[in-house]
Amino acid sequence: MSRPTRAQVAAGRVLIVGDAMLDRYWFGAVERISPEAPVPVVRVNREEERLGGAGNVALNVKSLGAQATLLTVVGDDEPARKLRGLLEREGVRAVLGSDPQLYTIVKLRVIGRSQQLIRVDFENQPDHEVLAGMLADYERLLGEHDAVLFSDYGKGGLTHIPRMIELARAAGKPVLVDPKGDDYTRYAGATVITPNRAELAQVVGQWLSLIHI
């Protein structure tokens, strides 16, 4: 199979569906230990916000030259507005559902002396299928795209993924899945599944060398 040309990649239209999040970074100087507990005191002097999760996947697709559309659900909160602004700035088309019961996922990393000191996660586990109300949007978007990429971070946004894969295959679209968890039967019908080494070991167990896979 030949590698696609740059022109072919640029002409591609990819629909990314999954768990989007906002990555926040606080950078600062560490000059002393807190008198309250044996932890460093970080004097923050710079903050950054970046696309995370499925948002970062969409950004990577865009950086390859393809057209990227992100379909996801976020909360009705300040991080959601930040996320929307970042997507707009990066040229990623965003179809964002808003769920007032959901916290937009934020991962805050505090960096001092060029190393990460702590990560704080802000999220809540939804008690309902957050993308269920967007299946009509998903079906409509299928006709406008050449492929579907599911970015599963296990945050509850892809409970309906078997149905979504079924709809994509019925529409003749290749399906790529970045998986999470140990139940890959959920991804039945996918064209390609791309676990990393740790994710694959979670499913098939540890191996000594590639010949054991």
Regions found by a protein language model. Name each.
Residues T5, R13-V14, L22-A147:
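Conserved N-terminal subdomain of the carbohydrate kinase-like
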Residues H145-G157:
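Short acidic, glycine-rich surface-loop motifs adjacent to enzyme active sites
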Residues K155-E166:
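Active-site core of PLP-dependent enzymes with the aminotransferase class I/II
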Residues D182-A190:
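Short loop/helix-cap segments at secondary-structure boundaries that form the rim of catalytic
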Residues L200-A201:
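A generic structural signal for short hydrophobic patches within well-formed alpha-helices
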